[in-house]
Amino acid sequence: MNTILLSFDTEEFDVPREHGVDFSLEEGMKVSREGTNRILDVLKANGVKATFFCTGNFAEHAPEVMQRIMDEGHEVACHGVDHWQPKETDFARSKEIVERVTGRQVYGYRQPRMFPVSDSEIARVGYTYNSSLNPAFIPGRYMHLTAPRTWFMKGEVMQIPASVSPCIRFPLFWLSLHNLPEGLYHWLVNRTLRNDGYFVTYFHPWEFYDLKEHPEFKMPFIIKNHSGRQMMQRLDRLIKMLKDNGNTFTTFSEFVEKVKK
């Protein structure tokens, strides 16, 4: 039986700022609150668990959504403090914020935009796993063709990369589900599962917001393509396919505990 690790980088929406649009935290939070609730609706309808990597900003400005995430059985992990301006001190501060808001211990970290992190600092602060690696070659973003494809240890911290296909290392993250034909994406996921025994992917709340209805965001086509309710449907069909094939959905912390036994 193979394992599915769904994850969501639960951050304030800031993509328009990358394209020169002045965008406030309040506006970004509105988009991300709605998107996160839509994600939770899909997960609840399918009865599956996931891991939500939350920024400190999101946790402090959407405590009611954080509560829903926990009430519905999902794991909360850390994703920095301010998604737009990550800092070296975020490892400790984001953990403090998220644990204060949730009242629960946090075990995992993912750096905004999957940028590199200090493994010694991750360990020092008390995280047991780090999921900040996309082992693919995407010019201008990720240059990790020689990095391990599957989980590995660095000291006491388990590294859990996002899944890429065997051999050619095609990334199986959010943009791929937006833009590939669904049948091809599902085929690549199943091939990866047969090879690795588990599958890790990640999405963002703002993908589930109706981006096409907001030209003022100046979003590139590959990002707004199949966004909003179309993305809800794509996620729903992906989950149903994976369940029908007998896979088990688990949180990252549960996966770490299982692997370490």
Where are these regions (language model features)?
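Short catalytic/ligand-binding loop motif for oxyanion handling, primarily in non-cytosolic enzymes
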Residues: 14-16, 60-62, 85, 116-120, ...
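Active-site beta->alpha N-cap acidic-glycine motif
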Residues: 1-72
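Metal-dependent polysaccharide deacetylase catalytic core of the NodB/CE4 family, i.e.
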Residues: 46-118, 127-128, 132-133, 158, ...
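Generic structural signal for well-ordered alpha-helices
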Residues: 36-40, 63-67, 91-95, 119, ...
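Active-site-adjacent pocket scaffolds in enzyme catalytic domains
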Residues: 16, 99-100, 104-202
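C-terminal domain-boundary segment and adjacent tail
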Residues: 44-47, 182-261
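The substrate-binding groove and active-site-proximal loops of carbohydrate-active enzymes
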Residues: 24-30, 54-55, 80-85, 106-107, ...
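Conserved, mostly hydrophobic/aromatic
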Residues: 9, 43, 79, 109, ...
